[in-house]
UniProtKB/Swiss-Prot annotation:
This is Ketol-acid reductoisomerase (NADP(+)). Residues 183-328 form the KARI C-terminal knotted domain. Binds 2 magnesium ions per subunit. Its cofactor is Mg(2+). The keyword Transcription regulation does not apply. Keywords: Amino-acid biosynthesis, Branched-chain amino acid biosynthesis, Magnesium, Metal-binding, NADP, Oxidoreductase. It comes from Methanococcoides burtonii (strain DSM 6242 / NBRC 107633 / OCM 468 / ACE-M). The keyword Oxidoreductase applies. Involved in the biosynthesis of branched-chain amino acids (BCAA). Catalyzes an alkyl-migration followed by a ketol-acid reduction of (S)-2-acetolactate (S2AL) to yield (R)-2,3-dihydroxy-isovalerate. In the isomerase reaction, S2AL is rearranged via a Mg-dependent methyl migration to produce 3-hydroxy-3-methyl-2-ketobutyrate (HMKB). In the reductase reaction, this 2-ketoacid undergoes a metal-dependent reduction by NADPH to yield (R)-2,3-dihydroxy-isovalerate. Pathway: Amino-acid biosynthesis; L-isoleucine biosynthesis; L-isoleucine from 2-oxobutanoate: step 2/4; Amino-acid biosynthesis; L-valine biosynthesis; L-valine from pyruvate: step 2/4.
Length: 335
C-alpha cells in the first residue's frame, strides 16, 4: 500500500523565511500562489512585462515582478508555465538568477524527465502536483479542506528536499487531503498516458466515432449528441464519486448488461495493443521529441487539428443544443 503524507507529517517551518517565486499565474499558478500566501509564506509572482495577469495578481494581494527579477529575489522558484515554453524561459530568465542552495519546483515532470531542463547539481529539485484543476485547488483550500497531491524529489542538494516538498504541499493545502510520494518519471509517464489514452484522446475519439456511427446509420444528429456526449457527464460523475461499482449499481439492468457484454468488444485486444504502443512512445521519449518539435514550429499541426475539431459535426450540433441549456454556463461559472 502506498504511503500517504498528511498535515502532521509536514512542517511549514521548512519554508519560513524563504521567498517563493511562482512563475506564471494561470490555472495552477493563481491557485497555488494564493494558497501559499494564505498559509503565511512569502510569495512573489514572476510574469513577463505586459502580461494581462499582472494586474490580476496584484489585485489578489500578491507582489509581482518580471520573471528574471523574481528568480533573483527568490530562494524557491516554482515554474508553472506551459510545458513547451518552460525550457526557453528557464535558460534565458530563470537560471541566471539562481544561486547554490536554491530550490526549483515543478508541478509536472515533463521538462525534467525529458532533459529539456537540466538543473545545476547545487539546486534542490522537487515536485508538488495537486491532482485537481486550479479552481478546485483554491476553492477547497478556502473551504478549509484540500485536494490530494503528489510529491517527488529529483535532486536533493541540501539534504532537506523532501521536507521542503512536504512543506510546500502543506502550503498549497494538499496534505489536508493526503499526498503520495512518486518520482518525476512515474508522474510524467502516467500523466501523459492518462491524457492520451483516457481523459482527452481516448474519450474524445470514442465520442466522435460513436456519434458518426449513429448519424451514418440515419439517426438524428441531435439524438446522437445526447446519447454519445451529453449524458457522459452523468456517468463520469457517478464513477468519480464511487468508482465503477457505484456506476454499475446506479444504471439500469439493461445498461449494465449491455455495457458489460458489449464494452469489451469495443475496447478490445487491438485497443490494448494500441495503448501499449502509446505507452512505449511516452517511455522512450518519442512523444516528447515530437511535442518539442511541434512547439518549435509554432504549433502548426496542433492549430490545424484544433480547427478540424471545431468543425466536427458533434461540435456544430452540440453548440446549438448547449445554447438551449443556459444552466450549463451557470455550472461553469460556479467552478
Amino acid at each position: 500500500m502506498v504511503e500517504m503524507f498528511y498535515d502532521k507529517d509536514a512542517d511549514l517551518g521548512a519554508l519560513k523565511g524563504k521567498i517563493i517565486a511562482v512563475m506564471g499565474y494561470g490555472s495552477q499558478g493563481h491557485a497555488q500562489a494564493q494558497n501559499l500566501h494564505d498559509s503565511g509564506l512569502d510569495v512573489v509572482i514572476g510574469l513577463r512585462e505586459g502580461s494581462r495577469r499582472w494586474k490580476q495578481a496584484e489585485d489578489d494581494g500578491l507582489k509581482v515582478m518580471t520573471v528574471a527579477d523574481a528568480a533573483k529575489a527568490a530562494d524557491v522558484v516554482q515554474i508553472l508555465l506551459p510545458d513547451e515554453i518552460q525550457s526557453k524561459v528557464y535558460y534565458s530568465e530563470i537560471e541566471p538568477g539562481l544561486e547554490a542552495g536554491n530550490s526549483l519546483v515543478f508541478s509536472h515532470g515533463f521538462n525534467i524527465h525529458y532533459n529539456q531542463i537540466v538543473p545545476s547539481k547545487d539546486l534542490d529539485v522537487y515536485m508538488v502536483a495537486p491532482k485537481s484543476p486550479g479552481h478546485l485547488v483554491r476553492r477547497t483550500y478556502k473551504e478549509g479542506a484540500g485536494v490530494p497531491g503528489l510529491i517527488a524529489v529529483y535532486q536533493d542538494a541540501s539534504g532537506n528536499a523532501l521536507e521542503m516538498a512536504l512543506a510546500h504541499a502543506k502550503g498549497v493545502g494538499c496534505t489536508r487531503a493526503g499526498v503520495i510520494e512518486t518520482t518525476f518519471r512515474e508522474e510524467t509517464e502516467t500523466d501523459l498516458f492518462g491524457e492520451q489514452v483516457d481523459l482527452c484522446g481516448g474519450v474524445a475519439s470514442l465520442i466522435k466515432t460513436s456519434f458518426e456511427v449513429l448519424v451514418e446509420a440515419g439517426y438524428q444528429p441531435e439524438m446522437a449528441y445526447f446519447e454519445t456526449l451529453h449524458e457522459l457527464k452523468l456517468i463520469v460523475d457517478l464513477i468519480h464519486e464511487g468508482g465503477l461499482e457505484k456506476m454499475w449499481y446506479s444504471v439500469s439492468n439493461t445498461a449494465e448488461y449491455g455495457g458489460l457484454t458489449v464494452g469489451p468488444q469495443i475496447i478490445n485486444e487491438e485497443s490494448r495493443e494500441a495503448m501499449y504502443v502509446a505507452l512505449e512512445r511516452i517511455q522512450n521519449g518519442e512523444f516528447a521529441r515530437e511535442f518539442v518539435l511541434e512547439g518549435q514550429t509554432n504549433h502548426a499541426v496542433l492549430t490545424s487539428m484544433e480547427r478540424l475539431e471545431k468543425e466536427h459535426p458533434v461540435e456544430v450540433v452540440g453548440k446549438k443544443l448547449r445554447a438551449m441549456m443556459p444552466w450549463l454556463n451557470s455550472e461553469l461559472n460556479e467552478e
